[in-house]
């Protein structure tokens, strides 16, 4: 991996006289073996995740330089493994594919980029959709053995991330045609649950199910912002996300999913053309009491973070440019989105709660100082 990182492309003017660039013949030999070695390692009876992660990154590093011109066979090699029943191999191939394609999310549009994406879509889009449907069916099947639920969930999470990668620049025709099939699949993942995927209540790390739902919310937000004209199912997405949000408490392990879900709702509110979904006073009141107030208030864990590292806490709380999913930031952005579309209504509702919180603080400052902070 380090060799691919430091010696794959070396400028002749800065080339190290001791460690020179890899020759073209050596590169060709390495390219021919990277994916087969990855598959071989993943097929072992007890595959080493540490080694597999290095191999995943090695393939991605070489692909960033050589795909597709010098390595046109890469996609065929990866796609050929999507039909395997070995979950370890599937996980490695999907993780490698995501490592290669995730860079598309932030790249500027260009003819070369679109040619690369179209090449991948032509070979991978339909197998990806078939695998997504298969993994979804197995995950929701009550007869699926418990021991396979974790790898299935990880595969599905990576498939959702790949779906986002391939949609980030433009809407693939294959995905557009599949939206009627995909929409009920995606919304079902926001209500589906299995004990094996929930995780330990004491664990602060997001569970596999939370990661899956976070990926679904990211896809919903992307498609709502970019491809609304082919998305008549948007009201169903909003209802599914709203119903899911009500099931999550204040635990730190749910911070990412709550932030992603609120981010999606903020994006839909800002559109303006979806006003009828939110404009009733009762809906806006529910937004305030069920989303804004609970997530804008300080929790015990927030106090602990502040006590351990106050500067870092303030930076996370105030700095808008850093990409950190915090509940308070998501709730504040949701208020701003509502103000853009329902200024009078939301000001009246929020002002009432602000006055109530300040009155509670005045009645008992030592006990209710968090109310003042929230106000």
Which stretches of residues belong to each language-model region?
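Internal alpha-helical scaffold/solenoid segments in large eukaryotic proteins
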Residues: 53, 68-83, 140, 144-148, ...
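Eukaryote-specific detector of the first structured module of a protein
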Residues: 1-2
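Alpha-helical repeat/alpha-solenoid scaffolds of the HEAT/ARM/MIF4G superfamily
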Residues: 8-142, 146, 169, 251-374
